[in-house]
Amino acid sequence: SWDDKNMLLSNDTPINIPPYLPQNSVAEYDLRKVYSRVISLDQWIGEKLKALEDDGLLEETIVVFYSDHGGPLPRQKRLLYDSGLKVPLIIRYPNKQRAEKRDDRLVSFVDFPPTLLSMAGIAPPTYMQGLAFEGKYKSKVDRKYIHGHADRFDESVDMIRAVRDKRFKYLKNFNPEKPYYLPLDFRRRLPSMQELLRMRDAGELDANQALWFRQSKAEEELFDTEKDPHELNNIADDPQYKNLLLAMRQECDRWMKQIDDKGLIDEKELIASFYPNRKVKQTKAPNIKINDLDVAVEVITPGSRLGFRYTSEKNPHYGWTHYKQPISSRPDDTLEIIAHRIGYKAVTHKIYNGAITEVLYPQTRIEYHDVMYSHKRP
């Protein structure tokens, strides 16, 4: 756990708190944890580079470093503001080629596959969406725009599309009747999120913090990221940006058509279309052998995987654990064994005190999503 003893950032180091977060010690503490983890990661990367050097491979290796999304704090990860989209990207070439050079080109994650192939001297296939920005098959043109999308937010659902050039960001909200803030159990565990909710309920949010808690959204948003890096001032209705807004809107429409965007299809229908004749195959029940409280499991369906968990309220086991070897089950506790292959229906066995008490077969994966995840969009 990352408590005070794990902090690697000096308390004397000043912290710049983004204006949409609480301007107090709660957010500062969360940010110190983030920066401490960055320091720890930097040390880990140094160890890997040293290992490559010791093995004589460092100057024969291209190292590409990037994160998987923007910041982890509220109004960052999962959102299409730069705080959620913008990530670090560092490329280390052998023998210090282009060392310490900064590059302001627009790069999208879809550019990574063709670029890595290009770096290896392999021509990217034409079906890849991205542009190679390095290597033998580097694209002759640079990106004018990058694009973003947000749909499912864990247990909450929305539909937002984004277009960004080097300065301006355009957002299209397909569900403007929904609030900006959507409750997510994982995010609610963050102290800064808990503090924002406390401040909201107490009426203590300032104007910048309150923006995220508006109960409906503008259909379109436009931000000047040069003048407004935190994207707090929507200029979509400003007449002087009328032509820019139109160009961004048209680019969003063009991109959605080009990639055959499925966002407007009801999620249940989209999932149903994945399967031949809309029918899902069933993972076969595994072979379960029980000896007193010892449980051994063997898969039957090729390619399927096994997981287990306990359901006792007194000593719960949160989430599934991969089955690797026979389990010594707990007395007077329910052990659940799940067999699942991706794209198939799962089967779950419940075991109590050495006996199988129940076998659960979902009716269809489609109906499961209909109950749990279905949503409609305009």
Regions found by a protein language model. Name each.
Residues 89, 102, 132, 146, ...:
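Conserved beta-strand positions that form and line the central face of beta-propeller blades
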Residues 1-113, 117-127, 179, 184-220, ...:
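Active-site-proximal cap/lid insertion segments
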Residues 113, 120-221, 274-288:
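C-terminal cap/loop subdomain of S1 sulfatases and analogous C-terminal strand-loop tails that border
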Residues 59-61, 143, 304:
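Short coil/turn segments at beta-strand junctions that form active-site/ligand-binding loops
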Residues 236, 246-250, 258-378:
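Short, compositionally stereotyped local motifs that mark structural "simplifiers"
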Residues 86-90, 162, 169-171, 307, ...:
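Residues embedded in well-ordered beta-strands
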